[in-house]
Amino acid sequence: MIGPDGCGFDMRSPSEMEADDARRESYEAAHAPRMAVTSRIRRVVQPEGGYLPLFLFDEVCLADPVPLFAFEDVPADVTGLAVDYLSRVARGVPARDAFRVPLAGARLVGRSADAERLLAMVDGFSDRSVRAACLLCGFDAASRRGPARWRAGRVIDPGPATVYNVRRMVARTLRFMDRVGPVVWEGFTFDGGYTDRVTSGDGDLLTADGLWDLKVSRWPPNPTYTLQLLVYWRLGLHSTHPEYLRVRHLGLYNARSDTMWSVPVARIGADAVRAVERDVIGYADGL
């Protein structure tokens, strides 16, 4: 910086420099990228193995004897959303509530009429209902990532193999929920816990003492998945919702492999929690 004397040195007093640093930090915090949990964690460089390594988890395979088809003709994220939302409908959640995120996305891109037509077809687990659910989930990205990230035609009308797989994975998910339930909150949020770095996000399900995320990946959980769980838990504890105070373990369930992974929160290191709260979520003091 060029000082008042025109030389290449900062001639301000220490107090002036400290005040300027404080203003700059305040500005950077206010203008830092704002994003959902899933977007934020993709940008995080984690230590080797991740903040929450998979070896800390206990793995249980539920071993559904009925196999899935190897090929699906819609994007993997859409398959996962369809399984999630249809599982909620199967448990009695009104379809409009279960599909609220893609419905909001459709409004953002001026396709509400199309979305409403598809929603009217979601009436159970018929082929027509599952196809409509997949097409409706195509609008989800417009809501979660912004209209600019939505692309018309990305999701095609799914074929028989995809419809069968979605239906079977919904059945597996319902069986899993019966095993770990009772489910006390589906689509949980973190009101009061969001920060300038994590401004939105919602999870899959809370049981009486567990926080679970649902996946349909073809691969084992990676550090991004486990970090997502850790971020959800800490956001929840900083939120206004007392349900998170009862969480004693975090878990992932993959309906494609019919496998669950869970870790007691007491097994998670304090240093990892502190780093995630401070560096990932943006809480000033951690813990």
Regions found by a protein language model. Give the residues of each.
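Active-site metal-binding core of divalent-cation-utilizing nuclease and nuclease-like domains
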Residues: 68-75, 179-206
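A non-catalytic, helix-rich entry segment at domain boundaries
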Residues: 113-182
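Domain-level recognition of nuclease-like catalytic cores that cleave nucleotide substrates
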Residues: 251-287
